[in-house]
């Protein structure tokens, strides 16, 4: 069974289109109006070993909030759809990733209980067109819509770029590991995720 999804989400504020194949490493295309966000999405999808296209149009281009939130929602929905009933997935993963002085831990459970706990000390208010207050919001919106319980904690570091990038790398690696098929069972004592 192919584990992929094609999701379009259009509101009065944005139009987001996401194609995601979590089993096939291939081309990654990302186009949003926020340059640093493009870099982070490419990083996330690369470390997931996926094939992906993300296209985001901002209909009300007065700040980056709607784009960040709506891409997170749509990408989360794409992962949830691609995983189907989650049969056979490893389900859990954690990664501790350095980027120079920064060290970030990501731990997740594909539990169908989407929530995020984000502890990042981002000292710069903006980087590459992205308000750093939207980084935790991205992770929260993504977790809620993907059904992932997500913990992200900064263990060390002071460079905002490094801290954010280590977070996206760690999330990508953790998602890759947690979505791998390890058997034919539903990994839950309830028999359903």
Swiss-Prot record:
InterPro entries for this protein: IGPD_sf, ImidazoleglycerolP_deHydtase, ImidazoleglycerP_deHydtase_CS, Ribosomal_Su5_D2-typ_SF
Keywords assigned: Amino-acid biosynthesis, Cytoplasm, Histidine biosynthesis, Lyase
GO cellular component: cytoplasm
Enzyme class, spelled out: lyase
Biological pathway: Amino-acid biosynthesis; L-histidine biosynthesis; L-histidine from 5-phospho-alpha-D-ribose 1-diphosphate: step 6/9
Enzyme Commission numbers on file: 4.2.1.19
CDD domains associated with the record: IGPD
One function term, GO molecular function aspect: imidazoleglycerol-phosphate dehydratase activity
One of the GO BP terms on file: L-histidine biosynthetic process
A matching Pfam family: IGPD
Catalytic activity: D-erythro-1-(imidazol-4-yl)glycerol 3-phosphate = 3-(imidazol-4-yl)-2-oxopropyl phosphate + H2O
Location in or out of the cell: Cytoplasm
Listed HAMAP family: HisB
Family indicated by similarity: Belongs to the imidazoleglycerol-phosphate dehydratase family.
Name of the protein described by the UniProt record: Imidazoleglycerol-phosphate dehydratase
Gene: hisB
């Amino acid at each position: 069974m192919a584990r992929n999804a094609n999701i379009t989400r259009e509101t009065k504020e944005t139009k987001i289109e996401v194609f995601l194949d979590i089993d096939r490493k291939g081309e990654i295309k990302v186009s949003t109006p926020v340059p640093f966000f493009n870099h982070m999405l490419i990083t996330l999808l690369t470390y997931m070993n996926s094939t992906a296209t993300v296209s985001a149009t901002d209909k009300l281009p007065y700040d980056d909030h709607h784009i960040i939130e709506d891409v997170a929602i749509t990408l989360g929905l794409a992962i949830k759809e691609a995983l189907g009933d989650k049969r056979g997935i490893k389900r859990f993963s954690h990664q501790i990733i350095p980027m120079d002085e920064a060290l970030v831990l990501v731990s997740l459970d594909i539990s169908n209980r989407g929530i995020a706990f984000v502890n990042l000390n981002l000292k710069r208010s903006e980087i590459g067109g992205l308000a750093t207050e939207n980084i935790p919001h991205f992770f929260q919106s993504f977790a809620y819509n993907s059904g992932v319980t997500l913990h992200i904690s900064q263990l060390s570091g002071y460079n905002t770029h490094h801290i954010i990038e280590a977070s996206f790398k760690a999330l990508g690696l953790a998602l890759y590991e947690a979505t791998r098929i390890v058997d034919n069972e539903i990994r839950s004592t309830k028999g359903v995720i």
